[in-house]
Swiss-Prot record:
Disulphide linkage map: none
InterPro entries: RusA-like_sf
GO biological process, one term: DNA repair
Keyword Hydrolase among record annotations: yes
Protein name: Uncharacterized protein PD_1345
Organism: Xylella fastidiosa (strain Temecula1 / ATCC 700964)
Homology family: Belongs to the RusA family.
Coiled coil regions, renumbered to chain: none
GO MF annotations in UniProt: endonuclease activity; magnesium ion binding
Gene3D superfamilies: Holliday junction resolvase RusA (3.30.1330.70)
Keyword Repeat attached: no
Amino acid sequence: MSKAMPMAACAMAGVKQMQSLTLPWPSKDLSPNARVHWTRRSKAVKQARGYAEVMARRAGWSGLSLPVEGRLDLWISFYPPTRCLPDDDNMLARFKPYRDGIADALGIDDRRFVSHPLIEDEVRHAGQVVITITGITQQASNGGPRLHAHPAF
């Protein structure tokens, strides 16, 4: 289901889909519910952000030619390590350092991302997060979002 949503959005707008980036399940120390010392949390944030940046660069995302304005749709599929499904708001908070690292690799501010989180039912060993960036979203004249095709996608 997670793959269908980005592809459907791309097909409607005539936007090509970027390749996916797979990252490990975020550390429990990044959870807003975690009761850990601030230095431990800070270390987990730094490690996750750096790892996401390196992996995004290895995937070739740093060489993309992005427009100066517009928002990027960030499709995030969370594949939990167990059948116990986490809350999507908790997972977005745990994902934030990854999001920052991807933005660092792209050379943009992470506020340009429009997040589309999906907690998958499929269990994957050790858990995974699959990220796909699809289109450029800009505000339409009627106030609603619209997708624009861009040659980089």
